[in-house]
């Protein structure tokens, strides 16, 4: 399995080193690239992201990555903002934008500000995740396992949801739409459970 071509898509706004290290610790070689040939010949792809949705989509556009990501046929895992970018639109405008941010549209989710009641934003720290039974991404991971989150926006629970988390209200912790997967938490910062999830993805 370690002979797979594993690629982290170089979005220009993501801190990829911790994701790269987490994959390498499992015995895989990793390439960071935005080259279409490298991306489309990969066996597994990661789409990490930090910052705002508007910033990230602008970076994808400037690097000609929007159509490229949509062409991917092998499993792709979006992490944190990378997962949110798989949705249709996001309310996370950044400071200057005054309308919804159009995202990649690879799943039906619309990213919204978390409704947390009296709980503070951002949602930061460890929280339990409840996965749908039988999804291979969570194989061998105990129900109610803890994962590490840092975010203020999320997708509501919908048909695309394969795992949920509760913070004031339920939100989507993981999605799947065909070959596109996404996790709102940071598996690379989530200890053994996170490592297991990355391994599960690499073994799909």
Swiss-Prot record:
Biological process annotations from GO: L-histidine biosynthetic process
Name residues in a coiled coil.
none
Is Cytoplasm among this UniProt entry's keywords? yes
Per the Swiss-Prot or TrEMBL record, the active site comprises: 80, 186, 188
Q: Which domain of life is it from?
A: Bacteria
Pathway(s) served: Amino-acid biosynthesis; L-histidine biosynthesis; L-histidine from 5-phospho-alpha-D-ribose 1-diphosphate: step 5/9
Matches recorded under Pfam families: GATase
Chain ranges of the Glutamine amidotransferase type-1 domain: 5-204
Question: Which Cys pairs are S-S linked?
Answer: none
Instruction: Identify the Gene3D superfamilies for this entry.
Output: 3.40.50.880
- A GO cellular-component term linked to this record: cytoplasm
What is the catalytic activity of this protein?
Answer: 5-[(5-phospho-1-deoxy-D-ribulos-1-ylimino)methylamino]-1-(5-phospho-beta-D-ribosyl)imidazole-4-carboxamide + L-glutamine = D-erythro-1-(imidazol-4-yl)glycerol 3-phosphate + 5-amino-1-(5-phospho-beta-D-ribosyl)imidazole-4-carboxamide + L-glutamate + H(+); L-glutamine + H2O = L-glutamate + NH4(+)
Q: EC number(s) in its UniProt entry?
A: 4.3.2.10, 3.5.1.2
NCBIfam families according to UniProt: IMP_synth_hisH
Q: Quote the PANTHER family the UniProt record gives.
A: IMIDAZOLE GLYCEROL PHOSPHATE SYNTHASE SUBUNIT HISH
Please give the subunit comment from the record.
Heterodimer of HisH and HisF.
Protein name (database record): Imidazole glycerol phosphate synthase subunit HisH 1
Organism this protein belongs to: Vibrio vulnificus (strain YJ016)
Its organism's taxonomic lineage begins at:
Bacteria, Pseudomonadati, Pseudomonadota, Gammaproteobacteria, Vibrionales
Gene name of this polypeptide: hisH1
